């Protein structure tokens, strides 16, 4: 049965792609050539096309005064690279079957933060009863004994209970509230249901936005996102991808079951390649669409280039950031095979608790205070700017608070005086500032640093990697090695030189290839060339959020005792003022975001641990006393070298 192209796309289940369509009728006559978004396309009656994907071409946004109703909505296009951070508002329109949910939502086991729904009534299964209103997480869709089933789970008493639901399962399923914060890119990729709009709340920014802000000045509120889709298709005898708007006035007929799809290009994305079985590699492919911003030193990923995809793999990288006082830092992924040599740089510690975490049995931690702190207890030490300490270990002590003895956690140190040393006990809750004094002159390779020291760790490249033509790390004055992460890669090479391979990151390189044939050459040993990869602010943010999501967050520092009764120092007051800030890394609009989320508990845990002190660090660097102390320390370090 013939349908308009728009009707067909509306009813299309994306899990069934690709689909082969025959053009039935429309305003496009045989032999006519039309310009469609930069691609010439002949859509004559009887023409056959293969739809490979449905992508969001652009996002239209409408500002709402309230989530429930809009007042004088003004629609505007939101740039796809807009660095806003958003909280998703749960959709109030129910889904009536599980099939409707799976057609509209992205459900993949590889995706974090799986979609969650609740049912208006109890669902009785063979071995389990899903209670009314209970949060159901949809993990994946797969065929079981010839029937398509949805793998689900519910969390009870900190334990997951798994079960399956058929696509035919009926009822009123409502979307659950989602407390996570998302970038616009994440929402576009997998948080906008097909054929629906998405209401979100702008909470902050992940990076500085140099272009004109499309939102009103100071706006933080509800926005309706309306996607405009484009169809990605291939045609016989063409090697490029055709992009068509679903609103194109033609009628089509689905002939997938009666047509040999092998007549078309087998076009695969980077993600499609990674999802192939291991036994299908190595394969030969031709690059159809090359990635933008390709960092490979050779033109290996150019359109028309024939490459060998040897296998898929995972590799460890060190996530590093440039040490700078402002927010516009550069970020890198450094392979563990990097041959450059590093020398240590002083670390900064915003609290005494950070000193306790950073101390090492390998060597005593020597620091200089950059902030003054007055202790309200005789049993605990006060600190002046310029005081030097050797950090030893944590210990408890009794203090007298309003006539009542209380046990407090402290950090045992040695205070270095001019001709002697004295014992000092710093309160762990102390919100101060310290800079490390480096005595170690040794040069380290990155593998040695990761093995001998706890990350994060500050370094500088002293000897560049001579095996790299252009070592981009050599010109960076200071780097913070933040954490070791594991990324997914495709190992590829030029067909003309299959022994020299390169790693292509699956999540950060978007390319399209056409499969040619299986590779019949020698699949023995080959040389893998790894690069230092510079990543964008958004990519850095996503890595920090998801690559370590399976780890528990670090323990929280001790709280100041009896805050209401004890006279607060300016430092502790500053700490209180920042305790409920929204956890959006490098957020530009702090005050407004704080008001928006001041009553939401648990938001801290949704943010990369390394980003939580950014605001405090920036505030700290503004204070003149600390800046002076830091300058003196670095001068001392340079003099020693």
Swiss-Prot record:
Entry GO CC: cell-cell junction; COP9 signalosome; cytoplasm; nucleus
Keyword annotations: Adaptive immunity, Cytoplasm, Developmental protein, Immunity, Nucleus, Phosphoprotein
InterPro entries: CABIT_dom, THEMIS
GO biological process, one term: positive T cell selection
Cell compartments where the protein resides: Cytoplasm; Nucleus
PTM summary: Phosphorylated on Tyr residues quickly after TCR stimulation.
Modified residues (Phosphoserine): 584
Chain segments carrying region CABIT 2: 260-518
Entry keyword Phosphoprotein: yes
UniProt KW Plastid keyword: no
PANTHER family, per the entry: CABIT DOMAIN-CONTAINING PROTEIN (PTHR15215), PROTEIN THEMIS (PTHR15215:SF1)
UniProt function note: Plays a central role in late thymocyte development by controlling both positive and negative T-cell selection. Required to sustain and/or integrate signals required for proper lineage commitment and maturation of T-cells. Regulates T-cell development through T-cell antigen receptor (TCR) signaling and in particular through the regulation of calcium influx and phosphorylation of Erk.
Family membership: Belongs to the themis family.
Protein name: Protein THEMIS
